[in-house]
Amino acid sequence: KITYDCNEINRFLTYARILDPRSKYGTFDLLDTYFEKPAFDYQHILRFMDILIANSDAYLGWLYKKSNNVIPRDTSVIYYDCTNYYFEVERPDDEIVDEVTGEILSTGLRQYGFGKDHRPNPIVEMGLMMDKRGIPISMSIHPGNISEQVTAVPLEKEVVRTLNGADFIYCADAGLGSYSIRKFNSMG
């Protein structure tokens, strides 16, 4: 049973990200400086983040629908692009391996991959889909060793569901125009 207010935590983290971006712990340290004094512990932020990531696709779809009531969207054209975030760490994240079977259960997000700056640091890739006005519709996060080419179609399928199957023109730079992406978009 959840004993804290998820909406309160989400609201506080959103305000804090806009006003004074910090780590979750750094943000929690500023809790008493806000006019509205939230009533939750640091552990509740971490538990909320687990809930948020487990429901991220549904949450992003909900955000799109709610924000569409405030700012009408023009989804006749959808823009997609990817970027990388570098981390000043010595090595990539470890794989999580099943101790019994030896099976790799998951790979950490920070991995060595191709970055435009050719830096020797692990990276995380983010893909973002925006409407014709440049307002985000959805996003995805991937390990840095994943090609951006394989991220477009799954995110586009999610956007198609969010838009209830509405037609739109897919627009991306040449790096995101592989045969498989063009084939998917030509199928209507």
Where in this protein do the model-derived segments appear?
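Dynamic "connector" segments at or just before major functional cores
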Residues: 1-108, 120, 127-140, 145, ...
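Short beta-strand-initiation
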Residues: 123-125, 179
